[in-house]
Amino acid sequence: MTTKPTRIRRGFITEVQVRWVQNGSLRNVEKSSDALAINVLAINVLAINRSIMSLRCREKRPLMMRLMRRVIAAFDQKLRDIRYQAVPRRAALLGLISSIALLTGGCATISPRNVLPQANAGQIDLEGFHNIRFWGDASAPAIEAIVMADAPRAQAQSSPVSNLLAISGGADDGAFGAGLLVGWSDAGTRPMFDLVTGVSSGALIAPFAFLGRERDGQLREIFTKYERKDIYIYNVHGLIDGSALADDTPLAHLIEKYVDAAFLQEIARERAKGRILLIGTTNLDTQRPVLWDMGRIAMSNNRDAISLFRKILLASATLPGVFPPVRIQVRVGGKDYDELHVDGGITRQVFIAPSIFSFVAGNQKPARTVTKRRLYVIRNGKIDPEWQSVSENVLSITTRSISTLIKNQGIGDLYRIYSITKRDGIDFNLASIPSDFSEVRSEPFDPRYMNALFDRGYDLASHTYSWVKSPPGLELTPQARN
């Protein structure tokens, strides 16, 4: 006997489908491959969610919600069981979200936003702060006007060489950059940087690199002592009543642990010397990169400075869909609004604001005579193509495509930076994870993997690391080097 569908205004779910969800597919999840299991569960979520949405969150919702939560629980368990190996972490998570992005909506419990109107989107100052941020894609004169306005000035360093550092994102691959910096310190050749920039996991490294080798012990600890549960907790229920797949409260607590009042005072002291620390986030409403002058925040004497400092670091590391976006409160015309900020790597995986090259050394008093400028770029990832057999299913294809997109976006950022250095006569130096590094993760933020990667970076830098002088595909000939 054919089961009559329970018809609803926009879509339907049959009793057969309900029993399939309750009995068949859930029993088979543990026997399925990861990709197949996730796709089966996603289909189940689709069927139930269509019904919930069509009911407009009213009658008959309890039954559908119970079924939904059971499927989500199985989905959650499957995610915990997955052993991410060859697939990059960010791409794997984005792939999962892309596969189920259309499955959710309608009944969210997120508090409503008071979105900053488009007409006021150019509002750059936050109440109580001045000249602490600027658009990362603004014209060079606009950036220079903000960074140089009322700029702290101090006695110039005696060195005629100006050293600049840019650190990319990379999630747990940030262990490479951390190890490289610590090894560089122990080799006795790491310079003091006039400018440090960071994005995503690079944003968590940058403040420690900015403060110098005295903070190397903490940098090592952050990237070798913690595991996934110390960074985030799976929250698949967020797919139906939230804004993210995971809860990043543990990461927020870690940031609070290391970024305390004394830390902020050190940042402020170095900014007073004319040194600059920039962290990048992405404003989702405007689709634009935002660069934050963290030293000015530290120097502001605003009681909310430490909270904002921490919030920006968290926002820069917030992969949208995986972690909830960070709301930044702004006040315009006596009214309170909010902006949504996420991973700076969405718009720039590594960055240097071009106009800063021209005046970072002149930001000191008396004006410093610089005869040479060096830029060091740490790319926390592999640059070379990596072969992988891709299964012909939605999840595998989506994940592989996104990982390829991310890798090539990062290479494009390197090309952009390289062209600026060639134009302005700056010595370009690039470090990235060696292609022969073969350690495999058992899960995201696997301590064994991160320790091995940290050690690899440390060993390279402590034995006179050979920095690459150009991005991939632009290898210089001996004549060009001269």
Task: Label the model's feature ranges.
Residues 96-98:
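Hydrophobic helical h-region of N-terminal Sec-dependent signal peptides
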Residues 103-106:
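C-terminal motif of bacterial Sec signal peptides marking the signal peptidase cleavage site
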Residues 108-195, 210-482:
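Patatin-like phospholipase
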